[in-house]
């Protein structure tokens, strides 16, 4: 891609990332994502447009509110950078197409879910349930999956985790996986097809185990420490989106 195109796509992604930050903060609290306009969560001062430029405004303000000087979480910039990078990566793979629009929306939903789950230990139905429907509808024009793949992915993704959660609760007598994770994997399957369920779960399980072990070693965390699984599922889905074909070919020797 030309440098100008990369810069434009990245800038577009960061603008969407700025909006995702609003969703991440407001959706768990049941607040509107369109009103009121952006404001400081500490002093409630409105954020002027020139203080709301993705990444740049954070750096120019030194990571603090212009009005009250309270520190702004660096997570805002991380979301904007991540969304911008995903936009560039998807544009590189899919180009200017309906596929780019659909899978960028999917990636944006995964970013939103990841940071909400990290902060609140929930995955809002307002994202995952419409996401399943959108994924199934998008399969009609997607170059990566067929409608049958999407349907089997949604049913298989949700069904696999539902079975795991049911078995865990029966054996251990406690909930081991929330309903949000089940619906998230169903959404992933709807967008990426039934083959994605294998890669997503493999990556999520390995990454989750490594992080859990690291926390127990370095922070002396309890073995029963609850770690949100949604971010690992989202990570696994993105790995499949970009590398799934090669992973499956390597794993099955084809």
Predicted regions mapped to residue ranges:
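Functional transmembrane core segments of multi-pass inner-membrane proteins
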Residues: 9, 99-207, 249-254
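C-terminal ends of transmembrane helices
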Residues: 21-27, 62-70, 110-120, 163-175, ...
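Membrane-proximal soluble regions of multi-pass membrane proteins
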Residues: 20-75, 229
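Interfacial loop-to-transmembrane junctions
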Residues: 178-180, 213-239
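Alpha-helical membrane-inserting segments
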Residues: 20, 24, 86, 90, ...
